[in-house]
């Protein structure tokens, strides 16, 4: 299962293996005390938005990509594509509203942003910015730009070419 990690220095000094991006993000944030907020209220908000991505944004945007970019021409029934376009629009509006007056989804930069922003970026890969009304969501557009300007994000996106 990907993504997965093995932390040789897990809880109580024993190795631990984890899969699922949300579980990995939460584990690493709690272990390091970084990107998880400075109090229980912050942590609750960050966790809420992490779960929003895990249970809504990620699955729905993933299905949008499948039906809009990859399988759309092969499937005569237009209802799946329409459903995921509409759901992506709705979820994008939720993100945009949450970002009003904020730089990051839950206040300070956090694991919630690490989970959410890449799915917004995926709309470009899917060729679905226009159909989802991306340009009408100014807060989300500015948010993704801020995310992509972060040095760690740039480093992560600079993957080496695969050998031929």
Where are these regions (language model features)?
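Terminal-tail/helix-coil boundary detector
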Residues: 155-164
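Structural helix-adjacent loops and short alpha-helical linkers that scaffold large soluble proteins
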Residues: 42, 83, 129-137
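Alpha-helical packing segments of well-folded alpha/beta enzyme cores
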Residues: 84-91, 143
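Residue-level signal for nonpolar/aromatic packing positions in well-ordered secondary structure
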Residues: 5, 24, 95, 113, ...
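GST superfamily/GST-like fold recognition
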Residues: 56, 60-65, 104-129, 136, ...
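Active-site-flanking alpha-helical
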Residues: 29, 119-120, 157
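GST-like domain detector, emphasizing the conserved glutathione-binding G-site
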Residues: 1-82, 86, 96, 105
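Surface-exposed helix-capping loop/turn segments at secondary-structure junctions
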Residues: 34, 97-108, 151-156
């Amino acid at each position: 299962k990907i993504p997965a990690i093995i932390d040789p220095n897990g809880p109580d000094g024993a190795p631990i293996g984890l899969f699922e991006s949300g579980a990995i993000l939460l584990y690493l944030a709690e272990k390091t005390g970084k990107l998880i907020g400075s109090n229980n209220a912050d942590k609750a908000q960050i966790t809420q938005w992490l779960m929003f991505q895990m249970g809504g944004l990620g699955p729905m945007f993933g299905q949008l990509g499948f039906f809009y970019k990859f399988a759309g021409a092969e499937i005569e029934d237009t209802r799946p594509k329409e459903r995921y376009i509409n759901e992506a629009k709705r979820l994008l509006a939720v993100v945009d509203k949450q970002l009003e007056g904020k730089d990051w989804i839950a206040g300070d930069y956090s694991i919630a942003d690490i989970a959410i922003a890449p799915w917004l970026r995926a709309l470009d890969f899917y060729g679905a910015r226009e159909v989802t009304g991306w340009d009408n969501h100014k807060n989300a557009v500015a948010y993704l730009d801020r995310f992509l300007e972060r040095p760690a994000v740039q480093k992560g996106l600079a993957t080496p070419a695969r050998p031929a």
